[in-house]
């Protein structure tokens, strides 16, 4: 089973991402702030972490840096999923250790395709 962490303080975004990626082969966990995201990641060891940049308590860039230092998250693929769309924002996300950077608003199909490409286990999902 694949585990995906959604870290975003906007419930509507969490719901959209959950709906997009929901599958019997996928466990989805979420966190509404950056500090909680680090704790959930430490406990759940997600295969993919989708991080908003602008979150309370700890921003997504700092969450990304912390996850990269955790041995239990060494395998985690990190996607910054954020409204910060400038080239400098993208550069900061990738420099923080993200594997990919997807801006809001995003296409649900683009998100699903990206997650499938990032994680080989995603191939167990049937085509929609």
Question: In which residue ranges do the predicted regions lie?
Answer:
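Short hydrophobic/Thr-rich beta-strand motif most characteristic of the beta2 strand and flanking loop
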Residues: 25-32, 40
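Charged docking surfaces used in two-component/phosphorelay signaling
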Residues: 15-23
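C-terminal output helix
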Residues: 106-115
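Receiver (REC) domain active-site loop signature in two-component systems and cognate sites
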Residues: 55
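Active-site beta3 strand of CheY-like receiver
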Residues: 44-50
């Amino acid at each position: 089973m694949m585990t995906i962490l959604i870290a975003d303080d906007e419930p509507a975004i969490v719901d959209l991402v959950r709906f997009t990626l929901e599958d019997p082969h996928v466990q989805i966990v979420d966190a509404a702030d950056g500090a909680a995201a680090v704790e959930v990641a430490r406990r759940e060891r997600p295969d993919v972490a989708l991080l908003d940049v602008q979150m309370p308590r700890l921003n997504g860039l700092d969450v990304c840096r912390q996850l990269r230092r955790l041995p239990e998250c060494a395998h985690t693929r990190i996607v910054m999923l954020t409204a910060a769309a400038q080239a400098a924002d993208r550069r900061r996300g990738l420099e923080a250790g993200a594997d990919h950077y997807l801006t809001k608003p995003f296409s649900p199909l683009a998100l699903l395709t990206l997650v499938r490409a990032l994680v080989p286990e995603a191939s167990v999902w049937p085509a929609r």
